[in-house]
Amino acid sequence: MSKKRYPRLFGILPFLGMLLLSGCNWTLLDPKGQVGIEQKNLILIATGLMLLVVIPVIIMTVVFAWKYRASNKAATYTPDWSHSTKIEAAVWIIPILIIIALGYFTYHSTHKLDPYRPLDSDVKPVQIDVVALDWKWLFIYPEQGIATVNKIVFPANTPVNFRVTSDAVMNSFFIPGLGGQIYAMAGMTTKLHLIANENGEFDGISANYSGAGFTGMKFKATATSQEDFDKWVAEVKQSPKKLDKAEYEALAKPSENNPVALYSEASPDQFQLIVDKYEGMNRGRPSHEEAGSKDLATTKGVESSMQPAAGAEE
């Protein structure tokens, strides 16, 4: 390839990159839940602060390379130069200030966006228990006494309290349009608190590779009005399927690309029974739930000032 063709090739590369990026989804930067909005703001702030260093370095690299090129006879030549107080001050003070700012935002966001921290709201939360299976998601509504597979429905502008575990390998529960992910582990209970600021349907995925059926381990999360949610619960209660012991054992067997399933009856204790199956794994150490309670106690002083407002608009 001749040297003349290199500039033309480099000119094409940005367009190829744009073509590839056109298929990307901007869900993380266009969230529909307050937790997701707070996380997006943190990403933008952290990226902006880091670009304060990156962009000047890139610009100076290009400028210096051009200004001090061999063919530029007008460039100042100072072979004995060794020190500049102004440069030293800039390369030390600016990064230190950026690190302090990053530390401040990161510290506050770590407590503010703690997945174990319940969202501040006057509306009663909806409780949903999540069980990761091979390769499908089981959702149990303990207060409504129903269960679903690969689909959840909840009211918009209402906090949703998720308890998450696994009856298979380690997994990760993630609804990108609403907020962050949380791991699902056998014999352990993790927690996640989310809210949808508006009605809509959101994609839910497994964010942790878990075997052959991993790519099909997806579900739909639908935020509706309270009235529509009540109607949906009534419809599920009409389903002929019941999540009894035999049905659960059949469901827990590995299977791929499972369709949505609705169960009119499910024991409120089903989630805890699944966790307790692995009781021997946790013998002699505190449960994840207890550890989370201790973490919350240590950060209680910053709880009220940094709570995401449930149902707030961006």
From Swiss-Prot:
Disulfide bonds: none annotated. This is Cytochrome bo(3) ubiquinol oxidase subunit 2. InterPro entries: CcO_II, CcO_II-like_C, COX_ARM, Cupredoxin, CuRO_UO_II, Cyt_c_oxidase_su2_TM_dom, Cyt_c_oxidase_su2_TM_sf, Cyt_o_ubiquinol_oxidase_su2. Its main location: membrane. It comes from Pseudomonas putida (Arthrobacter siderocapsulatus). It holds the Pfam family COX2. The gene is cyoA. Residues 278-314 are annotated as: Disordered. Residues 24-42, 108-314 are periplasmic. GO terms for biological process: ATP synthesis coupled electron transport. Cytochrome bo(3) ubiquinol terminal oxidase is the component of the aerobic respiratory chain of E.coli that predominates when cells are grown at high aeration. Has proton pump activity across the membrane in addition to electron transfer, pumping 2 protons/electron. Keywords: Cell inner membrane, Cell membrane, Electron transport, Lipoprotein, Membrane, Oxidoreductase, Palmitate, Respiratory chain, Signal, Transmembrane, Transmembrane helix, Transport. PROSITE patterns: COX2_CUA (PS50857), COX2_TM (PS50999), PROKAR_LIPOPROTEIN (PS51257). NCBIfam families: CyoA.
